[in-house]
Regions:
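Structural preference for beta-strand elements that scaffold enzyme active sites
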Residues: 3-5, 11-15, 57-58, 81-85, ...
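Acidic (Asp/Glu)-rich catalytic clusters
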Residues: 53, 70-81, 100-110, 161-165, ...
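N-terminal-biased segments
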Residues: 1-10, 88-101, 105-110, 149
């Protein structure tokens, strides 16, 4: 498994994504319910363990106590480094209901990369700035951690680069179909997404690379291998332990 260094931290090229763990399928309510029923703490830990066994050393998730507890147990069991990329996404996984609360939680629990979620940075704005983002990035850096944002929009990446916010990495959707999430209203083309990823030297953490299960790994991962920069990371989610093993076996041949 290739590795990528950001700042003083070294991450596996592939990250373990967690949307399925929390019942976020971006497909249907029935699949959401199926995932919620399947993924108790033991099954989540088993799936992450499969990733660890395949050389993955990083988990990407929204901030919540459940994932922090599971990661702590896995660190104790494996006696190995296990990085955490945590976002301030506000959802049903936690009672925390503000991005500031989520950020404080991530800093307290030493998330290697603290990610300000698209819910915050993609909000409509009357000017070119993103209110409060500079202070949040400074707070993350003052804690000795890496700062990221997640965004669905090309224009948000371009805005952050123009404003010089000091962001270390961007979580950003890229796949061969252009899928972002159901009912997404943005008009970016796949080529425009590729252009911003390749045009910005900073590392991206590419998400939705299989379009939330709509693209087979045998098609989606080669596309990412051809389009991503050498310093970009890829977050992959899995619906089961065996699915993790299958996808990571293919990824190991590509990355």
């Amino acid at each position: 498994m290739q590795q990528v260094t950001i700042g003083s931290r070294t991450f596996s090229k592939i990250l373990c994504g967690t949307n399925a763990f929390w019942g976020h399928s971006h497909f249907s309510e029935a699949r959401n319910a199926e995932y919620r029923n399947r993924f108790d703490d033991r099954t989540i830990a088993g799936t992450i363990q499969r990733c660890l066994d395949a050389g993955v050393n990083t988990v990407e998730s929204c901030a919540n106590g459940r994932i922090v507890s599971i990661l702590a147990q896995l660190r104790d069991t494996n006696r190995t480094s296990l990085h955490f990329v945590g976002s301030t996404r506000i959802d049903e996984t936690s009672a925390m209901n503000s991005h500031q609360q989520k950020l404080s939680f991530l800093i307290e629990h030493r998330a290697d990369i603290c990610v300000i979620h698209a819910q915050y940075v993609d909000r409509p704005s009357s000017g070119d700035s993103i209110g409060g983002l500079d202070r949040m990035v400074d707070t993350i850096h003052e804690a000795g951690l890496l700062a990221g944002i997640s965004t669905h929009r090309v224009e948000t990446v371009e805005r952050c680069e123009r404003r010089g916010y000091g962001i270390d990495t961007y979580l950003f959707p890229l796949n061969l179909s252009g899928f972002v999430y159901p009912e997404y209203q943005g008009k970016e083309t796949v080529q425009e997404r590729i252009d911003v990823v390749r045009g910005v030297s900073k590392p991206f953490i590419l998400v939705k690379v299989l379009a939330a299960g709509r693209i087979p790994p045998s098609e989606g991962l080669p596309f990412i291998a051809e389009t991503a920069k050498p310093n970009d990371l890829i977050s992959l989610g899995f619906g089961s332990e065996d699915e993790a093993s299958e996808s990571l076996s293919l990824a190991a041949r590509l990355f």
